[in-house]
């Protein structure tokens, strides 16, 4: 279940529950989490749409139309509807595995719970193994000389958590 920009209490009967406010990373995270569980066959998109980003509209568009060669979500009107961290294969798996239920604008917790109850036991598990997507983290290069370590690892080593670099304590 995707609650978009709304803050709604979690529904214990939903296999997965969370908000999404962006049409790129938010959509990517939904896809990666859904395809990692072959038992998820329905995704309820509800709550208030995020202005400008249109995460809900983009999720509907990627499910219906996929992405082009540049990773743009075909048919999305979001501000930056580009998928950069998952493959077209992962998008296709999402399209095949789930049915997306468009209830954008629905904020009534009781109606949402009813929909979850109606769909939680429908359908068989997707007939393929879960798909795991691992994207390498993009690392920012730091040219600054550290002046302090904000994480003490031991009496001998400290780490600058912003740069992600470990130093000997005596070098600072």
UniProtKB/Swiss-Prot annotation:
Assigned EC number: 2.1.1.-
SS bonds (residue pairs): none
GO molecular function: methyltransferase activity
Transferase listed as a keyword: yes
Keywords attached to this entry: Methyltransferase, Transferase
Gene Ontology process terms (BP): methylation
InterPro entries hit by this protein: MeTrfase_MtrA/MtxA (IPR030688)
Family named by the database record: Belongs to the MtrA family.
Quaternary structure, from the entry: May be part of a complex composed of 3 subunits; MtxA, MtxH and MtxX.
Protein name per UniProt: Putative methyltransferase Mtx subunit A
Species the sequence originates in: Methanosarcina mazei (strain ATCC BAA-159 / DSM 3647 / Goe1 / Go1 / JCM 11833 / OCM 88)
């Amino acid at each position: 279940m995707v609650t978009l920009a709304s803050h709604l209490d979690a529904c214990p009967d939903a296999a997965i529950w969370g908000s999404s406010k962006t049409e790129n990373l938010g959509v990517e995270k939904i896809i990666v989490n859904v395809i990692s569980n072959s038992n998820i066959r329905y995704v309820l998109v509800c709550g208030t749409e995020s202005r400008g980003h249109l995460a809900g509209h983009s999720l509907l568009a990627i499910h219906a139309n996929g992405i082009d060669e540049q990773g743009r979500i075909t048919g999305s009107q979001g501000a930056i509807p580009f998928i950069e961290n998952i493959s077209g294969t992962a998008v296709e798996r999402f399209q095949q595995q789930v049915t997306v239920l468009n209830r954008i604008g629905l904020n009534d917790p009781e109606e949402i719970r009813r929909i979850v109850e109606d769909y939680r036991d429908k359908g068989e598990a997707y007939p393929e193994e879960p798909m795991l997507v691992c994207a390498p983290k993009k690392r920012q290069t730091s040219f600054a000389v550290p002046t302090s370590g904000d994480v003490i690892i031991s009496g001998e080593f400290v780490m600058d958590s912003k740069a992600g670099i470990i130093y000997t304590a005596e070098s600072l």
